[in-house]
Amino acid sequence: MEHKKAALLDLTQYGLTGVTDVLRNPSYEQLFEEETRPDLEGYERGVMTELGSVAVDTGIFTGRSPKDKYIVKDDTTKDTLWWSDQGKNDNKAITPAVWDDLKSLVTTQLSGKRLFVIDGFCGANPDTRLNVRIITEVAWQAHFVKNMFIRPTEAELENFEPDFVVMNGAKVTNPNYEKHGLNSENFVAFNLTERVQIIGGTWYGGEMKKGMFAMMNYLLPLKGIASMHCSANVGEKGDVAVFFGLSGTGKTTLSTDPKRQLIGDDEHGWDDDGIFNFEGGCYAKTIRLSKEAEPDIYNAIRRDALLENVTVRSDSSIDFNDGSKTENTRVSYPIYHIDNIVKPVSKAGHAKKVIFLTADAFGVLPPVAKLTPEQTKYHFLSGFTAKLAGTERGITEPTPTFSAAFGAAFLTLHPTQYAEVLVKRMEAAGAEAYIVNTGWNGTGKRISIQDTRGIIDAILDGSIDQAKTKNIPVFNLEVPTSLPGVDASILDPRDTYTDPLQWDSKAEDLAQRFIKNFAQYTDNEEGKALVKAGPQL
């Protein structure tokens, strides 16, 4: 029944002609059969693993390709968008003419083919969600977006009209990129007037997920709704926490907590009703995953989950420790693969705790500090972490990075707009902010997940607010001297060095980087006033 109706779906309005068949919102069973067909070759082919989930290889792109991201500069966007020539971001402008050329490459590639169409929602709040239609010729890409977007009911599909269309032409590249003045033959491009995203040359699934996040980041703050690169969960008493952080800092791991219900692991909005998830699934890193350390995520890897770039041995077992292909090995799964989730809709009330996760490769920042409102704005705009190996193409060593709002790669408006909306929402809810370092200290080792979980527990149950504190110089951060279940010797990062002078010189180096980065926000009075909330030399 479903398939017969689907054949009638008219795709000519998107420039797609001669389409031989359309599989609209196929079942997981159908997708499994399609993506494991023995005649598939190359990156189209999925392989079965002993855990029951299919594994795929995304080729040379094992992460997003920020250098190949473009947005059409036209009357809609020219004055509102945060362009790459105005700040550190990936919003490179292209003309409508270049867009037309790129789009015709994709429509030519997808025309005359058998296509998968997935209709889904981005956003759990019906008032503000985007209806997204994804069109691809690759079965596992359809599986990926079925996992990651919110799955409509049969009734919701009846009258589904897309607000945004994503056409994934991963098999096609742009031979004229030099003439167009672009970075390479690959492209991920957006047109906010047409409300279309097109993809060429990269097979990485995350481009579709993060593409729609970037669009929500444009549309929601203009309505006064916070749009956030964060995970979120809720306790038994309805107490909501959000966890901001860049890739690899612990958003998914730390918000997946047996004692709390998961709202979502990566993208959320905050409106008058509270926190809501944008997504219908999770996209967890699997490098060095173990059943003991992360049972919820490990147990989510079963039939209907989709693994990316992991090493599958000849006996179908998975070597999660092998990062030879990439450190950015991942799994996508529908959110209900985690038992402990908010049901039936991934949303909850207002957040009381806002946690900024950072993975400090320098070994300077404390494992936890409570932030003042001014420090909250300062650290939100700074968005410091260390880029971890392989989450983007071309990065293999931990290197310091500053990413406004802990997600500059996905921001489409000026960072101060996100800071303003967030702080307004926090003040209205009486929320408090903390910075948590999940990175390294003077021992040269990463802070243990057990200690970090103990810190998070202390924040969530309020015991951190009763703890005695002391001040960490240079960064002027208040840190607890002891917390239940946490190794007290790590709470002051200076104590982890055999020679405390080492910390001093590293702290000075990192402070200078913070100051240099924050200079970009001092072009107005509010930005100038926030300098005092940052490190002082």
Curated annotation (Swiss-Prot):
State the InterPro entries in the record: PEP_carboxykinase_ATP, PEP_carboxykinase_C, PEP_carboxykinase_N, PEPCK_ATP_CS
Query: Which residues does the record give as ATP binding sites?
Result: 210, 229, 245-253, 294, 330, 446-447, 452
Catalysed reaction(s) here are: oxaloacetate + ATP = phosphoenolpyruvate + ADP + CO2
The record's remark on the cofactor is: Binds 1 Mn(2+) ion per subunit.
The organism sits in which domain of life?
Bacteria
Please name the top-level EC class of this enzyme.
Answer: lyase
User: Can you tell me where the transmembrane regions are?
Assistant: none
Entry binding sites for substrate = R64, Y204, K210, R330
Residues bound to Mn(2+) are K210, H229, D266
The record ties this protein, via NCBIfam families, to: pckA (TIGR00224), PRK09344.1-1 (NF006819), PRK09344.1-2 (NF006820), PRK09344.1-3 (NF006821)
Function per UniProt: Involved in the gluconeogenesis. Catalyzes the conversion of oxaloacetate (OAA) to phosphoenolpyruvate (PEP) through direct phosphoryl transfer between the nucleoside triphosphate and OAA.
Assembly notes: Monomer.
What protein family does this chain belong to? Belongs to the phosphoenolpyruvate carboxykinase (ATP) family.
Entry protein name:
Phosphoenolpyruvate carboxykinase (ATP)
The record lists the organism as Aliivibrio fischeri (strain ATCC 700601 / ES114) (Vibrio fischeri)
